[in-house]
């Protein structure tokens, strides 16, 4: 499991009943991929499940977001799409028959989202990649699933700036309900 916050990784390890290898690192930092790849080469693990859930979104028109920061759009694509593809590429050689890849997409993948354009496009990428990869890996019995939830109660909406209307919170699913 790769995540930015080591304390959350340790908490996750305590909560699950399966062995986990944890790796603290920010997938927006290039050196993390080299470190992760080096560790994979040393461990030669049998990866039974890969869950790609890293990502973020920013709310606002394309122009408004671009004015806030020149790299916000490309950072979003890098984390939501490129990181997912790179981690999948690195771990796939260590996956055998019956392994699973679960990619977190979003209901936003299914239609354009004004004021959330790049986020929706990035999740459409995740969905399309997952469908195609699933077809490619079918003969190896490695299963790929794209999970496309609607709004989920996480830190996502604080970071995105999307939750300006408190009524939107009424439609949110609890994160543990989506996972189980």
Task: Tell what function each PLM region has.
Residues 106:
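Residue(s) in the substrate-gating loop at a strand-loop-helix junction
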Residues 34, 41, 45, 55-74, ...:
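Conserved mid-core segment of classical short-chain dehydrogenase/reductases
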Residues 16-31:
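Rossmann-fold cofactor-recognition segment
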Residues 1-11:
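Conserved glycine-rich Rossmann-like NAD(P)H-binding loop of the short-chain dehydrogenase/reductase
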């Amino acid at each position: 499991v790769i995540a930015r916050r080591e304390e959350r990784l340790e908490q996750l390890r305590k909560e699950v009943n399966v062995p986990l290898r944890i790796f603290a690192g920010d997938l927006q930092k290039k050196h993390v991929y080299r470190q992760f790849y080096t560790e994979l080469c040393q461990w030669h693990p049998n990866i039974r499940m890969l869950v790609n859930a890293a990502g973020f979104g920013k709310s606002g028109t394309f122009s408004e977001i671009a004015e806030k920061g020149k790299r916000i759009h490309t950072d979003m694509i890098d984390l939501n799409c490129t990181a997912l593809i790179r981690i999948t590429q690195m771990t796939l050689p260590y996956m055998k028959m019956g392994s699973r890849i679960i990619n977190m997409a979003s209901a936003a993948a299914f239609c354009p989202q004004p004021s959330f354009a790049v986020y929706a496009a990035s999740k459409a990428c995740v969905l399309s990649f997952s469908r195609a990869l699933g077809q490619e890996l079918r003969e190896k019995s490695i299963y790929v699933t794209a999970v496309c939830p609607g709004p989920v109660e996480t830190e996502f909406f604080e970071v995105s700036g999307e939750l300006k209307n408190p009524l939107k919170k009424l439609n949110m699913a609890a994160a543990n309900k989506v996972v189980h």
